[in-house]
Amino acid sequence: MSQKHLHSIHVSHYKHTAGCATEVMPVPDVVKISMSQHIGAPAKPLVAKGDRVLAGQKIGEAGGFISANVICSVSGTVKAIEPRRMVNGAMVPSIIVENDGEYETVEGVGEDRDPSTLSKEEIRSIVKEAGIVGLGGAGFPTHVKLTPKDENAIDYVIVNGAECEPYLTSDYRMLIEEPEKIVGGLKVILQLFDNAKGVIAIENNKPEAIKKLTEMVKDEPKITVCPLLTKYPQGGERSIIYAVTGRKVNSSMLPADAGCIVDNVDTVASIYMAVCKSTPLMRKIITITGDAVAEPQNFNVKLGTNYQELIEAAGGFKTEPEKIISGGPMMGQALFTVDVPVCKTSSALTCFTKDQVAAFEPTACIRCGRCVSVCPSHIVPVMMMKAAMNRDCETFEKINGMECMECGSCTYICPARRPLTQAFKEMRKTVAANRRKKG
């Protein structure tokens, strides 16, 4: 198996919660369940104010081909359907459910099911009905990903267990606490692709996970565990495909175009739960960490739980946070309020003290080339920044600015402290909007 690697950086891991076993967080009195927890069209509400709903009930139906169902995480009463703020600041239609404390589930939830008796289309339908999306942060509807144009061209199914983002440990805890779900979910996916082999890719700074998964798959002829070098952004889709297969994927391609299906460990475990245990997506494992947090921890959380309640479950703040990030410091989203709900793509809440947050004034580029040397997309950030400063979309496209994966490596390494990644995010949005206008 190939062991190639794209350009990368070494970052401090800060995996302080790696040894913290996942705890089930107390269920809140109210959950706020967004209709837009995925890439694509928002889901359409299927309930009305005053309705009683059950845990496991579909309360939002996919609003298009690229969309996903939304499942209620508690039983109770719909108190409102109204716009609520999400992590990215957008006001999104949401269903507010008052938890009745009975935790009554839809009939059939939790029942065992033998996946070997299911057809490929039945498996895909179950995944769709369960509301499963890419849980590593992308949020792409999983049933769509599992339906490539040519399923016979898929020869790799890669389980992404790299978790290269600093501070995050939720995937690691799942690897060592629930490996049977990951292996079981991978076996289900392999039923869909007759020519594929399964690879569980884990960075080599997680030896316990590698050992445990290797032992679990020793008698599985189509599944192997692939230890990866510990680099950032090793968990990026393009990076992990190249590391495992030696194949390159650009922005105009899907992983399926390179014969690969890539799913995060939580996504694969959720497929197992949906197909083998008749349990739709109702929960997430979330890391709450950072020096401002009294008791950093990994929590098993009901979707729709408020971030503020997550903080309280971790003992609150031991010191006033200077910055709070949904996710990790490299690719996470800074928050101006914690009055937002946990959604399908949530992975962590990282709370920094003032001492942890460095504020620098950017200075002039010294053309050192460090940003070029670490870019996994092999593009030239220094030239892209010039185009971004001039709002020159044409040049930005010509120099392959749309190949940027927004990993933050260039910003991290820049001695002039220039906000490269932020500028590229804005330019990519502008270029994409211009393309849509042109049709």
Residues covered by each model-derived region:
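Histidine-anchored nucleotide/phosphate-binding helix
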Residues: 176-191
